[in-house]
Structure formats: C-alpha cells, structure tokens
A protein has these predicted regions:
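A general structural motif
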Residues: 16, 43-46, 71, 131-132, ...
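N-terminal active-site segment of His-dependent metallophosphoesterases
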Residues: 1-66
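Active-site neighborhood of divalent metal-dependent phosphoester bond hydrolases
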Residues: 61-143, 147-185, 195-198, 202-211, ...
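Active-site environment of divalent metal-dependent phosphoester hydrolases
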Residues: 26-30, 56-59, 81-86, 142-144, ...
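Active-site neighborhood of phospho(di)ester-bond hydrolases with catalytic His/Asp-centered motifs
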Residues: 22-23, 48-52, 76-80, 137, ...
C-alpha cells in the first residue's frame, strides 16, 4: 500500500513532558512560536501535536514543515492541504495556496518532502499521555447511520481506524476514498452550530445555522474510546468543545488567532491559549 494512504500511528508521550495540541498552522511559524510561548511550552521536553494543514496560505511553510517532519517533539496528522502535496493533486493544491512550493522549490525537492510527509503524517493519530487517550484527525469524525431509519451510530475510535485500515486493502476500491471524509468533514460541526444557535449562542458565526429545520436535526454523539478527539479544518470563532470533540482552527493565517490547547491532568478540562494581533498576552479559556 502506498505511503500516501498511511492511516494510523500511536504516540506515547512521556509523563515528564507536557502535551500541547495546536490548530491549523498554514505556514505561520512565527504565530506558532507565539502561541506556544503563551501556553508555557518548554522546547527541551514538551510535545506538540497539530491537527493538520501545516502548509499553504502562510509564508513560512518550510519552517513549519521542518519542525513537524524532523523534530521528534512535533507531530501532525495530515490535513486536506497536506494531502494535496502528498498525492500531487496539483490543480486543487495550486488553487488553494500551494503556489509557494512552485516559487520556492524544484520538482525533486517537492517530491522528497511529500514522501516524508506521507511517511510521518498519518490520517489518524492516537496519543497516550499520563493515563489519558486522545484522538486526532483533521476534518472530524463523520456521521454514520444505522441500517434502519436516520439514527446516528455512536463512533468508537479504534473501530474507525480498523475499518479504514481494512477498507484500504480492497483491491477494487480507490484507497484514498475511505480517508477523504476524515480530512474534509464539515457535517458534524454544522450540526453543532445548529444546536448552539438554538440554545442561545448569539455569535454571528453560529446564527448562520439558525435556519436549519429542527425536525432534521441530528444529535451529535461523543466519540467512544478516547477522552477527547481534536480537529481542525473548519474555522470557528473560538476554541470549541462539544461532547468530547474539540475544534481548534480559529483562523490563525487569516486573523492572527492561532490556538494551542492543553488538557489539565487534575480536572480533565481543556485550557486553550489563543494569540491576538492587538494583545500580546492573547486569550486564555477553559472549555466547558
């Protein structure tokens, strides 16, 4: 099986290291450094996990790639932008911010970096740290439905991975077909937005979902088998927790707001640190 369809890896983080999750970086290395500083990151021992989309749209793509490909304390799942480069989807990649590679690199270098990305950036990442288990996948964990009616299945993390691993071996199917929903999903976050708009959330971002028909509302289940599962891909106005699904893409490349998250060992709650263009102290939140 080609490495571009590398499905899953497990990362075991030493207890003495702190663990941080970061949203879509999109080539903004300086912003990443600022966000990690806010969170109290220690470069000598701590570990950083990204939810994908390391590249495109920003101007420091090579610096970001150097961190996550060649520094063992940095690891990332692949996002849809990373996948463009890995599989050589040139039309979509160039249209969505990939021209930096054409301007800065020759063809052989692009190929070599893409091969390293394919090997080191899985679709799913399981992270074990201080007795907790976390999942990371870029777009989301999409809905699947029971055979009868429109009732949604409750996803189980390890089962999802096993299903995709098995499906990629089907000689009659395109091996990338089964991973695309996990890189691109937005259906779940739309249902979450609809739920929040119906329950008093007044932020304009969520009000765009207010027109959804309530009778078609789908209850978003938690993902079983992990304490939390972290996503990016869909921009949110602030770090968002729903059930045990965490959305961290706060639009850093567009608005200067990049988010880093850390799970508190004692309370089990998530603290987030978001950079701010105006206030160098950023914004700290505890997700409820």
């Amino acid at each position: 099986m080609k490495k571009e369809f590398n499905v899953h890896k497990t990362l075991v983080v030493p207890d003495e290291a702190n663990l941080f999750f970061v949203g879509d970086i999109h080539g903004c290395n300086d912003l990443l450094e600022d966000a990690l500083k806010l969170a109290g990151y220690n470069s000598k021992k701590d570990c950083v996990v990204c939810v994908g989309d390391l590249i495109d749209r920003g101007t420091q793509n090579l610096q970001v790639l150097a961190k996550f490909l060649y520094n063992p304390r940095f690891i990332s799942v692949r996002g849809n932008h990373d996948q463009f480069m890995i599989v050589g989807d040139w039309a979509n990649w160039m249209y969505n911010g990939g021209m930096w590679a054409m301007n800065e690199l020759d063809a052989d270098t692009i190929k070599n970096i893409a091969e390293d990305m394919a090997e080191k950036m899985p679709v799913f990442l399981t992270v074990r740290h201080r007795g907790k288990k976390f999942g990371v996948v870029h777009g989301g964990v999409p809905f699947t439905y029971k055979e009868c009616g429109n009732e949604v299945e409750t996803p189980v993390w390890d089962n999802l991975i096993a299903q995709v691993e098995a499906a990629k071996e089907d000689p009659h199917d395109h091996p990338g077909y089964h991973i695309e929903p996990y890189l691109w999903d937005r259906d779940v976050i739309q249902e979450i937005g609809f739920y929040l708009s119906k329950n008093g959330e007044e932020h304009p971002y969520f009000q765009r979902y207010a027109g959804f028909k309530e009778k078609y509302m789908v209850e978003v289940p938690e993902v079983k088998g992990v304490d939390f599962v972290f996503h990016g891909h869909t921009g949110v106005p602030y770090p968002l927790l729903y059930k045990n699904r965490v959305y961290l893409d706060t639009g850093g490349v567009f608005n200067g707001q990049l988010t880093v998250a850390q799970v508190n060992d004692e309370t089990g709650k998530i603290t987030t640190f978001t950079t701010d263009k105006i206030d160098s102290c950023g914004v700290q939140r505890i997700l409820q």
